[in-house]
Amino acid sequence: MFRRLITMCAALSVLAAAGIAAKEKTVMVGGAAMYPWKDIIDNAMNSKDHTTLVAAVKAAGLVATLKGRGPFTVFAPTNAAFDKLPKGTVDMLLQPAHLDMLKGVLTYHVVPGRLDSKMPKEWAHKGKATTELKTVSGDALWVAMKDGKLWLKDGKGMTASITIPDVYQSNGVIHVIDTVVMAK
C-alpha cells in the first residue's frame, strides 16, 4: 500500500512538472534553447547572442545573485546592443577599477519580480501609455506599448526594443533587448 502511494505521488509530481513546462515553452535565443526549468545564468551562458552580457555579469560578481531564487525580470541586451555603445565602453566597464559602474549598468537591466509581456498590455488597457518600473539599481525604467511592440525608455531618454519577450526561467523571465539602457 505504501509503495503504491509513493508511486502515485511520484507520478503526480511528474505530471505537475510537465504541466508547468508545457505552460512555459522553450524559446530559442542566440541559437540555443532557453529551458524554463533552468535559471537565468545557465540559459544565458548558452546564448551566442549574450556572450558580452555573460562576461559582464561574471566580471561584476553577479552570477550567484542571478542564479538565486528571484524572481527577477532581466532585460538582456544582445552583443549587438553592446556594440552600439561608444568604442571602448565595454572594455572600460570590464576593468576592475570600474566595477561599481558596471554593477550599476547591469542592475539597471533587472527588475524584482516576474514581469511578462502581458502586463504592459493590461496597463495599456487601463489607460496607461507608459509604466514606470523600479530597477534593482534603484533607478526608474519605463515600459510602453507602441504599435503592438514593447519598448523600454531609460533615464537618458533612449529607447530599446524588446525583440524577444517572455523567455521564462526557473527564477524569473528574460526579455531580449536591442539596446543597452542607462540610468541618468
Task: Report the location of each language-model feature.
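Bacterial N-terminal signal peptides
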Residues: 9-16
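Mature, structured domains of secreted/extracytosolic soluble proteins
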Residues: 20-184
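Cys/His-coordinated Zn2+-binding motifs and related Cys/His-dense segments, i.e., zinc fingers/knuckles
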Residues: 2, 19-20
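Bacterial N-terminal signal peptides that target proteins for export
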Residues: 1-9
